[in-house]
């Protein structure tokens, strides 16, 4: 996969230390199967155009503008110049405001990851100093930056020779867990916990990206390949039901019985291995 072009260029600042940096998305959707909308009768691609909701006439790109709705069919028109006039300093600067212990941000607040790197040789040293200092103190930096005309809170995490920038969801965007977890039974059966722990230890592995491969993506690629060859897509054979599946026909299952069977199955496979 070829390196992507930087999504954002600007400056990383800490106190009096500043260096030019570039930020690139850490994830990609370009390898995903994408579809076009076609006219089923002709096979031709369908295209869309913006039209005026009242006159019905097409609207050219240069005629488009932003508008804030203040009432029904009543908008405040904003030009590009208007929007640029309210740009913040964070449009081109990531000024690290504070530091927090690494790992102290709950995952639910993390949104989109970016790779942050020095953008020229002159800034390499300053960038390395900031990154190494955060690594040594085992902290992450908290800052803000404007992305897509919106100021976003971000956290900067030293990683390898670079820094990973995570955009953060704002506090009011994350629903309190207490709204959902209140009333859940706190006490658990000790034997049940021990049984689950045994299963966990058996299935413990080191992380690998292959663990989260997309089976739908693979199936789509195979379907498309079959279509290209003008063959009917092969149907996956239905998996044979196992003895365990036959035994578990009821929707109501005794948790301890299920756990005992799971542990016995894990131990049996361990001995066989």
UniProtKB/Swiss-Prot annotation:
Homodimer. Interacts with LigD. Residues 13-190 form the Ku domain. With LigD forms a non-homologous end joining (NHEJ) DNA repair enzyme, which repairs dsDNA breaks with reduced fidelity. Binds linear dsDNA with 5'- and 3'- overhangs but not closed circular dsDNA nor ssDNA. Recruits and stimulates the ligase activity of LigD. SMART domains: Ku78 (SM00559). One of its GO terms (biological process) is DNA recombination. Belongs to the prokaryotic Ku family. Residues 227-251 are annotated as: Disordered. Residues 228-240 have a biased composition (Basic residues). It comes from Allorhizobium ampelinum (strain ATCC BAA-846 / DSM 112012 / S4). The keyword DNA-binding applies. GO terms for molecular function: double-stranded DNA binding. The keyword DNA-binding applies. Pfam families: Ku. InterPro entries: Ku70/Ku80_beta-barrel_dom, Prok_Ku, SPOC-like_C_dom_sf. This is Non-homologous end joining protein Ku. Transmembrane segments: none annotated. Keywords: DNA damage, DNA recombination, DNA repair, DNA-binding, Plasmid. The gene is ku.
């Amino acid at each position: 996969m070829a390196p992507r072009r930087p999504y954002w260029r600007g400056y990383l600042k800490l106190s009096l230390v500043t260096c030019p940096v570039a930020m690139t998305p850490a994830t990609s959707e370009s390898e995903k199967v994408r579809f076009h909308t076609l006219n089923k009768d002709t096979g031709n691609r369908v295209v869309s155009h913006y039209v005026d909701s009242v006159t019905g006439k097409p609207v050219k790109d240069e005629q488009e503008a932003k508008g804030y709705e203040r009432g029904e069919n009543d908008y405040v028109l904003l030009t590009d110049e208007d929007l640029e006039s309210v740009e913040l300093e964070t449009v081109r600067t990531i000024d690290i405001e504070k530091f927090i212990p690494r790992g102290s941000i709950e995952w639910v607040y993390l949104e989109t990851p970016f790779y942050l790197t020095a953008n020229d040789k002159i800034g390499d040293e300053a960038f390395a100093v900031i990154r190494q200092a955060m690594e040594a103190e085992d902290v992450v930096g908290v800052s803000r930056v404007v992305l897509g005309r919106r100021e976003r809170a971000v956290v900067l995490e030293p990683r390898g020779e670079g820094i990973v920038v995570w955009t953060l969801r704002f506090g009011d965007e994350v629903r309190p867990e207490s709204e959902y977890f209140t009333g859940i039974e706190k006490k658990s059966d000790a034997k049940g916990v021990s049984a689950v722990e045994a299963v966990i230890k058996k299935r413990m592995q080191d992380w690998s990206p292959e663990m989260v491969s997309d089976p739908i993506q693979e199936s789509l690629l195979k379907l498309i390949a079959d279509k290209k060859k003008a063959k009917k897509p092969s149907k996956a054979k239905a998996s044979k039901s196992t003895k365990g599946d036959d035994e578990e026909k009821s929707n109501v299952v005794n948790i301890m019985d299920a756990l005992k069977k799971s542990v016995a199955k894990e131990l049996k496979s361990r001995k066989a291995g």
